[in-house]
A protein has these predicted regions:
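Long, amphipathic alpha-helical "stalk/connector" segments that mediate intersubunit docking
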Residues: 30-48
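C-terminal motif of bacterial Sec signal peptides marking the signal peptidase cleavage site
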Residues: 20-23
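Mature, soluble, non-transmembrane domains
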Residues: 85-182
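Short amphipathic beta-strand and strand-loop transition segments with alternating hydrophobic
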Residues: 33-34, 79-87
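Bacterial signal peptide processing site
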Residues: 25-27
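Solvent-exposed residues in well-ordered beta-strands and their adjoining turns
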Residues: 38, 50-52, 97-101
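Bacterial N-terminal signal peptides that target proteins for export
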Residues: 1-12
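Post-signal-peptide N-terminal segment of Sec-exported extracytoplasmic proteins
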Residues: 45-73
Length: 182
């Protein structure tokens, strides 16, 4: 049964932040910061925050555009794009589009990875956590690299809602799945 479950899915989610939230639905109207891994490998990030400094939308948008332009300099194609920036009261909402997860990681200066387990290990990511299935089965993270080196894995370290294009069969025990099971 265990091998069948794991063979049916190539997706393993390992979010290393103890506060991370997980979802497989749409992130079009998030309540907090969200990360959407799209089918084409691009990433959509929505950042929700508070405007304690009472910065204006134009100033905030100009600052983000400046960061995007600085990141784009020296690159052949644009890889980060500001989709939207809004301020309502003291609530800030920013949506950024990244060409790839590598652009997301580089732009935000955070570790992030999408690929197979074997390559994740060569990049220094470890799988020491416990992993759970929807049915409540537990797996040691230490057995995953040995038994399933070609399994797909998504590694993030930030507390946020995560949405993926496929159903996750395993997820780390420091995550919370949405009430609807996603």
């Amino acid at each position: 049964m265990r091998q069948r479950i794991l063979r049916l899915s190539i997706v393993l989610i390992s979010v290393l932040s103890a506060l991370a939230l997980f979802g497989c639905g749409s992130a079009s109207a998030p309540d907090g910061t969200s990360f959407v891994l799209n089918r084409d490998g691009s990433v959509t990030q929505t950042i929700i925050g508070t405007n304690d400094d009472m910065i204006g939308r134009n100033d905030l948008s100009a600052f983000i555009e400046q960061q995007v332009e600085a990141y784009a300099s020296g690159r052949d194609e644009p890889s980060v794009e500001l989709n939207s920036c809004s301020i309502e009261g003291n609530r800030i909402s920013i949506e950024l589009q990244y060409a790839s997860i590598d652009d997301y990681a580089d732009f935000n200066h955070v570790p992030a990875y999408d690929g197979d387990v074997e390559e994740a290990l060569t990049k220094g990511f470890l799988f020491g956590s416990r992993f759970l299935t929807d049915s409540g089965l537990e797996y040691s993270g230490y057995t995953i690299p040995v038994e399933y080196p070609e399994m797909r894995v998504l590694v993030l370290q930030e507390p946020m809602t995560v949405s993926i294009p496929e159903k996750a069969v395993l997820y780390s025990d420091n995550m919370k799945k949405n009430d609807d099971g996603s």
